[in-house]
């Protein structure tokens, strides 16, 4: 439990410290502190607190200590869906972003990502202010966690379509080499990506390099450096401007 709490505190620190590399002041960064793999249970019972599975903790406020302002959920720290929606509405009305980037369940099957998408849409319901554009991204595909294929610095191919009835509108932003390097350095600052890969994964990667000619990322050992540092960003337009 102590290791899980430490990991959460490090993630909270990373969420306010690493954006400074891109010129985003910590006053504009907020950590909500809800617990991993519990959003689905929160959504199913909106009033029922869902404690951490690993940290022996049922209070989100431990991970909000670096926030520059209070949120509605700070009143009791209860990890409930109603608190999450209230927190999101307060943030949306405070920041009033023109563009919101969020996970898209059309491609990404992660339960927390699906629920995070639903939470943002629910928080937007009934607000007089609305963003101009919603953009979706995917960290994982339903059947292939190696997407996007290829090496660091390469392009990003479109993923396979899982549902022909659903229209996906891609949007691509080019990144100069200096921007790719800045992104790689930001990823390297994230504690989640710093531990060495397990032995089995290192052996598999060595075999892939030997037999398939796959190049390791020059930026780091974690697979995310290969997948995320590319010559362009690929997102999907969920709500056009």
Where are the regions a protein language model picked out?
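Metal-dependent de-N-acetylase/amidase catalytic core
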Residues: 2-14, 21-24, 35-241
